[in-house]
Amino acid sequence: NITATCVRVPVLNCHGESINVEFEEEFDMQELKQNLCREEMIVLLDDPKKEIYPLQTFVDGKDEVFVGRIRRDYSVKSGINMWCVADNIRKGAATNAVQILEKLIGKRLGK
């Protein structure tokens, strides 16, 4: 079985990644999507039938990671394939540095 994603987008900024995740156990797709929606820095854009999915051109200047096109990965027993995009200057560098620092300060203060 094969799960494939092909994307051709000429952009100056922002990264896109096709990510495959394999779980140890079976999972419920709706529950997985609900859990992603609960995460503060993740925005779920996942309705391919209505052409709603993350594009690099939409995320420039934003801190969040945008996730979509979530589907079962049939090349493994319990897996998914998803498309993620983020502003690589903000999420890949500046915002991540601030978030890491906040976590370290929080741990030091016992939060």
Enumerate the language-model features and the residues they cover.
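C-terminal substrate-binding/catalytic lobe of Rossmann-fold NAD(P)-dependent oxidoreductases
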Residues: 1-81
